[in-house]
Amino acid sequence: MGRLDGKVIVLTAAAQGIGRASALAFAREGAKVIATDINESKLQELESYRGIQTRVLDVTKKRQIDQFASEIERIDVLFNVAGFVHHGTILDCEEKDWDFSMNLNVRSMFLMIKAFLPKMLAQKSGNIINMSSVASSIKGVENRCVYSATKAAVIGLTKSVAADFIQQGIRCNCVCPGTVDTPSLQERIQARDNPKEALKTFLNRQKTGRFASAEEVALLCVYLASDESAYVTGNPVIIDGGWSL
């Protein structure tokens, strides 16, 4: 018996990183996983795993989301993972940077929840998990102005949905990681003028002396997706190795 037997889980940004690790972890625990991403080639790699089906989806496009939602008969868990990390202070951020991050990091979750929540309400049960960060309203982080603003908004969105629909059988939580070793992190490190120094800076702020793995975060997501967390809602759940202490 798996911890997620029989559950239908839809997640975004499943082609790599935390999304991919979570899709695999959900499937191992018996869930029927519908994994979405804009990256078709990487997404197709998941097709070989039992319990996972894939669908190309741009979460910034409302029409695509609404069409996708119309094709799904039942959903138990919605996991909104898609996001982008902008590097810099407010002075390094142009309006287009702000708009892009807000669109991908916040508006996409708004659109996904709006599309799938009615199905959950009709079922009188549903579970929404949003990807936030400790770089948000939890902790001020240098050179993460836009990113932190978007992730603070995700916490607010999460709490609002949880409060509004708690009596209709809906739960909503968000995951707040610290620094996670993902392809996205490695790309950001390599994009810096001095990648070796950038890696050192990232590691120096880790009180555990290491990054989290995507698989560690995925295990927390399994718990939040399962009935084991049935009494947990409206929470920003921190997994950061003590970084925010």
Swiss-Prot record:
CDD domains, per database record: DHRS6_like_SDR_c (cd05368)
Predominant cellular place of this UniProt entry's protein: cytoplasm
Give the main EC class: oxidoreductase
Q: Which reaction does it catalyse?
A: cis-4-hydroxy-L-proline + NAD(+) = 4-oxo-L-proline + NADH + H(+); (R)-3-hydroxybutanoate + NAD(+) = acetoacetate + NADH + H(+)
Keywords (A to Z) from UniProt: Cytoplasm, Lipid metabolism, NAD, Oxidoreductase
> What does the record give as the active site?
147 (proton acceptor)
E.C. number(s) listed in UniProt:
1.1.1.-, 1.1.1.30, 1.1.1.104
Q: Which SUPFAM superfamilies does the UniProt record give? A: NAD(P)-binding Rossmann-fold domains
Q: What do we know about what induces or represses this protein's expression?
A: Down-regulated upon E.coli infection to limit access to host iron pool. Down-regulated in macrophages by exposure to bacterial lipopolysaccharide (LPS).
One Pfam annotation reads: adh_short_C2
Query: What protein am I looking at?
Result: Dehydrogenase/reductase SDR family member 6
Q: Which organism is it from?
A: Mus musculus
Q: Which gene encodes it?
A: Bdh2
